[in-house]
Structure formats: structure tokens, C-alpha cells
Amino acid sequence: MKPLVLLVALLLWPSSVPAYPSITVTPDEEQNLNHYIQVLENLVRSVPSGEPGREKKSNSPKHVYSIASKGSKFKELVTHGDASTENDVLTNPISEETTTFPTGGFTPEIGKKKHTESTPFWSIKPNNVSIVLHAEEPYIENEEPEPEPEPAAKQTEAPRMLPVVTESSTSPYVTSYKSPVTTLDKSTGIGISTESEDVPQLSGETAIEKPEEFGKHPESWNNDDILKKILDINSQVQQALLSDTSNPAYREDIEASKDHLKRSLALAAAAEHKLKTMYKSQLLPVGRTSNKIDDIETVINMLCNSRSKLYEYLDIKCVPPEMREKAATVFNTLKNMCRSRRVTALLKVY
């Protein structure tokens, strides 16, 4: 009720003010004043009241003050104080319209020598009075649903399968490669897959170095070269392990290199064991003493078993480069034997 009483007192206040010299009001200012009076009436009607029927009384035609009468009363309103040089903004809470009108710049009438400064009553701010105005319709804020976060893209990586080294039943040094190996190069992102094979092999790519392919010229690699290559790979692996073993980016490559090294060592041991077995056999009686009959049987059996490929074996172009010197010695010996009369006579018997 206090805000309503204050507003009514403000409306009735100009009648109790003593008469001061009148001022000249322009039509625009008069229109702004009339609009402001209408805004005040709307504010008075929008103030909630505890008494029922209060709003009906304010809307009744018996209202004493009209817009025109209040507009005429504001023409004679003059108050002492500092003049406001800025424009005031009125906001209607119902229609949400904004009206700007000048509050200063009143020109006194011609013929008045005294200059009086006037301040409109609506520019006076009370010190200890607080007015709470409520709109007829409450403001409802629509809560917008928050956008759902996009699911994080899952990074897919090629599966990594470790090789399996199994011992053969015939020899403890021979390894068979049963499961495929799939490695992922971190720098290039290319997966390297090796299909399953039962035959021991030395070809393949490691995560540290891409060695030369052994499958192209297997006869050009002897036992010493293979062991030297394995030692080089082992030294490189040891250097890689000493450099950085805690980095998870290199851990998988190091494990793959270890597996390849184990396979290479096992294959080298199997090859060495096979060579030792061949040296002990009768096919290659090198470095051991034997009787004459055993040597004859060995040579005849070897020539008989390879008789279908003697033409290929006797061609110098098919012999590996490191064995051409020995092959030339054998070929010259055979030529000399074929030219001798003794061998020709012996061959005629057969």
C-alpha cells in the first residue's frame, strides 16, 4: 500500500505547491507529459492490492483525474533545483515500449527578467523509499536443452600378434613359424603382416631396420654372413634399449625386435646344427679319414642321384660366384679325364 500512497501523493502534489511564474511548454513536451501520465496510471493499476475489487474502483469512470486535466496541471508545474540536462527513458512494463523525452531546456516567457531553473518531479529520487512493481503476466524463461556432447572418435589400431616360437620334434634348434605377425610402424602407420609358414625363414622386416631380403639369393649368404648380420641386429637392439626404454611409443617396437632376434638366433642355431649333421654324413666326407671303398660309394651315389641335373651343374653360369673357382677345378679335371685314353677305354667297357 505504501507505493500506491506515494504515487497518489505525487499526482496530487502540484495542487499544493504555491504558484510560480509559468513556463512555456512546446507541443512535443506536452505530448511527452501526457504519455508519462498515462504510464503512471498504468503503473498504479498494475500495483497488486490485498483488497478485492480495488482494481475495479480504479477502472471506474468516477475517477477524478483525467489525462487532459493532469496534462494541463503539468504546464503550471515549476520546482526549484538543478535542471536535468539529460533525457529520461520511460518503460511501460506491460507494452515493453520505450519513450524518450527531454526533461530540460524549458525557455521562460519573453518579458521575464528573472531566470529560474526548474526540475520536474519525476527526476527527484527519494532516499529511503523503494517501490516494487509487478507486471500483470509473470516472465517465464524457457529453458533450452543443452546440446549433447559429440561422442569422442575412437581410434582404431591394427591388432598386434606376437610370433610363437615352437621347438621341432626332430631337432631342438629348428623353429616353425605358426601364427602370423602383424606389426604397426609408428612413423608411417602401415601395418606389416607376415603369413604363417612352416618353413624356417630369415626374411622379414623389423621395427628398427629393413634388412636386405634373403629370399632373392639364398645361396649368396654363408654361415658367417648370417651370424654377422645377426650380431649387427643385436647391437642395434641393445643401443635402442639403452637409449629409451620407458617411452610407450617404442615399447611395442622393442618387443617386436626382440622376437625377431630370438627367431633369427634360433634359425642360425638350426642352420649350424644342420651343417654339422651334413659334415658327419657320408654325402660330404670333408675333414675326416675314410677308406677308399667308402669314398667311391659316396661319389657314385652322389653322381647317380644328380644325373638328371648334371648338365645344369656343369654350366658355369649356374654356379654361385663364390664357388666358381672350385667348380672350374672340377670341370678341368673332368675334361682331362674324358680326353685320356685310359678313361675312354674304361668307359667303353660299360
UniProtKB/Swiss-Prot annotation:
Location in the cell: Cytoplasmic vesicle, Secretory vesicle, Acrosome
Keyword Ion transport among record annotations: no
Keyword Signal in annotation: yes
Annotated signal sequence range: 1-19
Pfam families for the chain: SPESP1
Tissue specificity field: Highly expressed in testis, where it is localized in the acrosome of postmeiotic stages of spermiogenesis (round and elongating spermatids and in ejaculated spermatozoa) (at protein level). Poorly expressed in placenta and fetal lung.
InterPro entries reported in the protein's UniProt record: Equatorial_segment (IPR026743)
Glycan-modified residues: N128
Key words, A-Z: Cytoplasmic vesicle, Developmental protein, Glycoprotein, Signal
GO aspect biological process, one term: fertilization
Reported modifications of this chain: Glycosylated. In testis there are two predominant forms of 77- and 67-kDa and a form of 47-kDa, whereas in epididymal sperm from caput, corpus, and cauda there are two forms of 47- and 43-kDa. Testis forms contain complex carbohydrate residues. Epididymal sperm forms are N-glycosylated. Then undergoes significant glycosylation in the testis and that the majority of these glycoconjugates are removed by the time sperm reach the caput epididymis.
Domain of life of the native organism: Eukaryota
GO cellular component, as recorded: acrosomal vesicle; intercellular bridge; microtubule cytoskeleton; mitotic spindle
Annotated family: Belongs to the SPESP1 family.
Function: Involved in fertilization ability of sperm.
Protein name, per record: Sperm equatorial segment protein 1
Name of encoding gene: SPESP1
